[in-house]
Amino acid sequence: INGDAKGIVFFEQETSEAPVKVTGEVLGLAKGLHGFHVHEFGDNTNGCMSSGPHYNPRNKEHGAPTDENRHLGDLGNIQAAGDSPTAVSITDSKITLFGADSIIGRTVVVHADA
């Protein structure tokens, strides 16, 4: 995507045991599926190169959002129409906004061509 995409995404979690609701929209995506992931570092000064790998504090394998064995940062794909904002609407029970495994302060990366 080369940094051409931009948008706003909200993460909401009522309690530490509740799922996280991810909502928002991304502009500038080409038509098709795009990976949507939380990366390890909150540094995006050099695009996704400085954000590190997918957030994976438990050393799991890369997987789909519904897989038991997956990186915490693996949130699946978003579908872009190519000519309008791309809606983000994800509910995830593995990521958290609380405690040692919190995603707060990390970078969200949208990958081209998932």
From Swiss-Prot:
Biased composition (Basic and acidic residues): 58-73
Swiss-Prot/TrEMBL catalytic activity: 2 superoxide + 2 H(+) = H2O2 + O2
Any one GO molecular function term: copper ion binding
Subcellular localization, as worded in the UniProt entry: Cytoplasm
Cofactor needs: Cu cation; Zn(2+)
Residue ranges, annotated region (Disordered): 49-73
Cofactor note (record): Binds 1 copper ion per subunit. Binds 1 zinc ion per subunit.
Name listed for the protein in its UniProt record: Superoxide dismutase [Cu-Zn]
Subunit structure: Homodimer.
An example Gene Ontology CC term for this record: cytoplasm
Highest taxon, organism lineage: Eukaryota
EC numbers on record: 1.15.1.1
Binding residue positions for Zn(2+): H54, H62, H71, D74
One Pfam family recorded for the sequence: Sod_Cu
Species assigned in the record: Drosophila madeirensis (Fruit fly)
KW Metal-binding (keyword) present: yes
Function statement: Destroys radicals which are normally produced within the cells and which are toxic to biological systems.
InterPro entries: SOD-like_Cu/Zn_dom_sf, SOD_Cu/Zn_/chaperone, SOD_Cu/Zn_BS, SOD_Cu_Zn_dom
Keyword Zinc: yes
Keywords: Antioxidant, Copper, Cytoplasm, Metal-binding, Oxidoreductase, Zinc
